[in-house]
């Protein structure tokens, strides 16, 4: 049977651990709040950009004179799928939901006899698809070493996609990403 001193030390240790856990919880809550604010601040810009691109694409009457990027190749034989996930885990269904949707689309593309090419952005997506679809992965991008993701990283991904398009490496591109609704829900 433990002595009274041993019990006091154990109680003290548990209380100390509780204090540390509470502090970590407060830091995590502050980081989550900041991330949520940033996501909500960027939403109007992304919606406006989406509307501009859709209006531009819909306003083109003659496909022959339209820029190749908007008019497309006119075929749908080769699909480039860009899977965007996190580099770190412990975020619930964030990565799993988007990978599930992507895998369903990969199966459909392959079943239709189309050529599939995949670019992964984030290590968690690659980890989840590499067993079944690893042979289709043409490029792996990870920004794990960067503390904060900015426009430069998005531009890097965009340049890779544009370079592949100009080299006629694909006919259609599908982006798989989560749309932030709130802290609990991200829609793939």
Locate predicted features.
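Conserved loop-to-helix interface motifs that mediate assembly, gating, or partner/ligand docking
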Residues: 2-188
């Amino acid at each position: 049977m433990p002595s009274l001193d041993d019990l006091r030390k154990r109680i003290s240790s548990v209380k100390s651990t509780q204090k540390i856990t509470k502090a970590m919880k407060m830091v995590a809550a502050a980081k989550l709040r900041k991330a949520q604010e940033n996501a909500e601040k960027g939403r109007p810009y992304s919606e406006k950009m989406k509307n501009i691109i859709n209006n531009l694409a819909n306003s083109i009457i003659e496909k022959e004179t339209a820029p190749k990027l908007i008019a497309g190749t006119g075929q749908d034989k080769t699909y480039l799928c860009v899977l965007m996930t996190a580099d770190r885990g412990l975020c619930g269904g964030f990565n799993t939901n988007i990978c599930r949707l992507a895998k369903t689309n990969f199966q459909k593309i392959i079943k239709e006899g189309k050529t599939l090419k995949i670019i992964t952005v984030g290590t968690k997506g690659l980890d989840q698809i590499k067993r079944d679809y690893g042979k289709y992965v043409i490029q792996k991008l990870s920004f794990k070493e960067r503390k904060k993701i900015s426009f430069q990283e998005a531009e890097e991904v965009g340049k890779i996609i544009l370079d592949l398009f100009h080299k006629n490496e694909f006919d259609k591109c599908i982006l798989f990403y989560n749309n932030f609704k709130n802290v609990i829900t991200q829609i793939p």
